[in-house]
């Protein structure tokens, strides 16, 4: 494991432990609200928030999580399943 200038542990592909923990916390929190929400607007807002997060996410981390699937976390039909998968993978990386 290497250290970058900020002292963050660098994992393979330039992904820091902080990056993984941040993504896990964000996805975990949004998933918990999403799975219990009965408000369609709130669920849409969560999908939008995740899409915005993905846009700014470390590209190497997204590639690792998505396994090359370009619509990962961005497809309405598979959104909840993708969030669960991302959360599990991120938890395993911590």
Language-model region placement:
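Heptad-repeat amphipathic alpha-helical coiled-coil interaction surface used
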Residues: 24-27, 34, 43, 50, ...
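Short terminal alpha-helical segments
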Residues: 2-38
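Short amphipathic alpha-helical heptad-repeat segments
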Residues: 19-27, 50, 54-61
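Generic alpha-helix initiation/capping and coil-helix boundary signal
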Residues: 16, 42-44, 79
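Amphipathic alpha-helical interaction surfaces
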Residues: 33, 52, 56-63, 89-92
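Amphipathic alpha-helical binding modules
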Residues: 65-94
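Short, intrinsically disordered, low-complexity terminal segments
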Residues: 6, 20, 46-48, 83
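Charged, low-complexity interaction regions
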Residues: 32-44, 61-62, 72-74
């Amino acid at each position: 494991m290497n250290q970058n200038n900020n002292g963050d542990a660098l994992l393979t592909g330039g992904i820091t432990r902080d990056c993984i923990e941040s993504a896990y916390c964000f996805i975990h929190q949004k998933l918990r609200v999403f799975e219990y929400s009965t408000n369609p607007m709130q669920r849409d807002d969560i999908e939008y928030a995740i899409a915005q997060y993905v846009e700014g996410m470390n590209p190497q981390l997204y590639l690792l999580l998505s396994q090359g699937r370009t619509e990962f976390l961005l497809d309405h039909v598979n959104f909840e399943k993708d969030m669960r998968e991302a959360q599990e993978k991120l938890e395993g990386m911590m």
